[in-house]
Every structure is written in structure tokens, then in C-alpha cells.
Amino acid sequence: MIRLSLIIPTYNRARQLLAALESVVRQDMPAGEWECVVVNNNSTDDTAARFAAFAARYPALNLRMVTETDPGVSYARNRGIAETSAPYMAFIDDDERINAGFIRAYVEFFDAHPDAVVAGGRIIAEYVSGRPAWMSKYSELPVANPMDFGHAVRPFPAGRVPGGGNMAFRRSATARYGGFDPSLGRVGGMLIGGEENDFFERMM
């Protein structure tokens, strides 16, 4: 039984996506209890072909790709929600890597906290050649969206919500509150945000 669906929207970042998937296939959760659904948001590069070749290497895992033709991360996330049925859903971005216990941690959290609807975790920015000199502690938040409140399970600080690169929620939440607002969120190279804040504010 699939207990959690990991959803990864992607657009024209085949190389980064494959690096993310390399971390996904190392999950320590039994393969029959999770799936990974990549939402191809009309990529024009070789994302589809490279994903197919990658997935063929892991026939025992539930790896699949679906397509969303309307551009924008909100449309892509909503497509991922529509194409899955697991009671729990988690989202990461296509340029991230997750640790081996990522999926198991979310499943165990929701199992242990039946009243919890939403959860989020650490997002640690990694810079290829060091933190850019122009980036201040103020500009890093909207650009890299780092988030680190430690390892302990606790409520999110007042005024903060999970980041889109590491968030999870119960499927029942989307049935009650709807999905992501397509008028918000990144579209192609346009770094428009706000879709996560809007989504979580509807739940509060």
C-alpha cells in the first residue's frame, strides 16, 4: 500500500532532476509503501527521455512521470496531487537532495500526530562555489529559502510556514481547502512566489 507520494515538479532541469532522484532511490522506507511522481511542466529539454532511462534502472521502485501542460509550479503541484492517491503527500524541488530517512520521517510523523495536517522540514542551501558576496541574510531568504529550526519536532514559529522545497500534508487537506492557486508561484524563469503561503494560510 502506497502511504506517501513524493511529488517533484520540474521544468527544463534534467541534470538537477537526476541528482535529486539519485537521493530519492536511496530511501530506507519499504519500496511498496511510497512512490515518486515527477511532474514534467512542459519541459523542452531531454527531461522525459533521461527520466525514462533513469527509472528503467529501478524497476522495483514506484517511479513515474506525468505531464502538466499549463506552465507554472502551482499547476504542476496540483497535477501531482490529482495523479496520486496516497494519504500523505510530500513535495521537494527538482534541484534538491533528500536524506535516506526523508519519506519514513514524514510517514512516522503523521502516524504519530493524527491531528497534524501540515509538516515541513529543514532546507539547507548549498552553494557550488561558496555563498555569493552579494547575498545578505535578508536576500538569502527569498532567493534560496533556507530553513533550519533544528531536528526536534515542534510547531512552526509564529509567522512562518513550511517551504515549498520540503513540505508535506495529508491528502484530506486538499479536499477541504483546495490546492495551490495557479495565479501564484513560479512560471518558467519568473520567480514569483506566494503560493505556499496562500495554501497554508487557508488551513490556519
Regions of interest found by a model, annotated:
Residues 1-26:
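N-proximal low-complexity "stem/linker" segments adjacent to membrane-targeting elements
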Residues 2-5, 35, 198:
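Cell-envelope/extracellular polymer assembly enzymes that use nucleotide-activated donors
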Residues 23, 40-50, 96:
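A conserved acidic beta->alpha catalytic loop
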Residues 68-84, 105:
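Glycine-rich, basic loop-to-helix element that forms the pyrophosphate-binding segment
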Residues 89:
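Short aromatic/hydrophobic "clamp" motif used to bind/position activated sugar donors
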Residues 101-135:
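Conserved donor NDP-sugar-binding/catalytic core segment of glycosyltransferases
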Residues 121, 138-160:
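Short, flexible, basic/aromatic active-site loop/helix in glycosyltransferases
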Residues 164-169, 173-178, 185-204:
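A short, conserved alpha-helix in the catalytic core of glycosyltransferases
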